Amino acid sequence: MSIRRVVVLYGGISEERAVSLISGQQVVAALREAGYEVTPIEVGADLRDTIAALTPAPDVVFNALHGRFGEDGAIQGVLDWLNIPYTHSGVRASAIAMDKAAARTAFLAAGLPVAEGRLVTVEELAEQDPLPRPFVIKPANEGSAVGVHILHEGDNRRTEIARSWSFGGQALVEEYIPGRELTVGVLNDRALTVTDIRPRSAFYDYESKYAEGGSRHILPAQMHPDAFKRALDVALAAHHALGCRGATRSDFRYDDTRAEPGRLVLLEVNTQPGLTPTSLLPEQAALMGMDFVSLCRWMVEQATCRA
């Protein structure tokens, strides 16, 4: 199949809309530089408008959406129904990866290292600590560190967090893993490298991820070689455990305060890695010899094998 016409979907209706707008603009420019005929479609709340904009059908849809509707299997199902090839993972992998509790179950079944944790109701959270402190509270279905809180000893925000919770009736709570934030990009069957993320603040939050100068990225990460290889292996195994396709990015905590090689814990798999100027996957691809235009072209070419 000769690919000429590519639609880039960006924007969306999630908490991560602003990130998606930046990703989409970067992708549109890169694909035009690569020689494709590119049509950007800013996705809003009315699905009928999006479907109408996809008529006539393009050769490929580049999905640059993040969060709800963009990476939870919803838009993937629409594109499958329209029989249009699209980038990144399909319905099932996207839905499971976005549901952090379901992803945990899949990781455990595959024998991958995860933090101790469980789903709790907001009422349970309001009443008492669900785990020994310190622990992390996170939405079950959000990305980009949206809604994430860390509670240490002496922190009295738990009841306030529960009362103001706006991410459904449940939250995922997990033990807090001290140490370093790591990430590994995967392109199909290839784990790229390990990035050590050094946020300017104490926590790798939304601002640290996307603000200019919010974090420092060290790649390849300087760490015990056994742990480095383990991170690559686990990222690839997690990609396959969820049935992902194309590009993903696996996030880890690495507790190097323990005896070597330290404790590596898988946090999540991102099926729609960010493609902003400060994003991690493009940096890793560049280190491996693939510039941003080539990365976007690769993603489009990977979409040709399915519809």
From Swiss-Prot:
Residues annotated for Mg(2+) 2 binding in this entry: E268, N270
E.C. numbers: 6.3.2.4
One of the GO biological process terms: peptidoglycan biosynthetic process
Binding site for ATP: 130-183
Major site of localization recorded for this protein: cytoplasm
Binding-site positions, Mg(2+) 1: D251, E268
Top-rank lineage group of the source organism: Bacteria
Subcellular location: Cytoplasm
Function description: Cell wall formation.
NCBIfam families on file: D_ala_D_alaTIGR, PRK01372.1
Family: Belongs to the D-alanine--D-alanine ligase family.
Protein name as it appears in the record: D-alanine--D-alanine ligase
Origin species: Granulibacter bethesdensis (strain ATCC BAA-1260 / CGDNIH1)
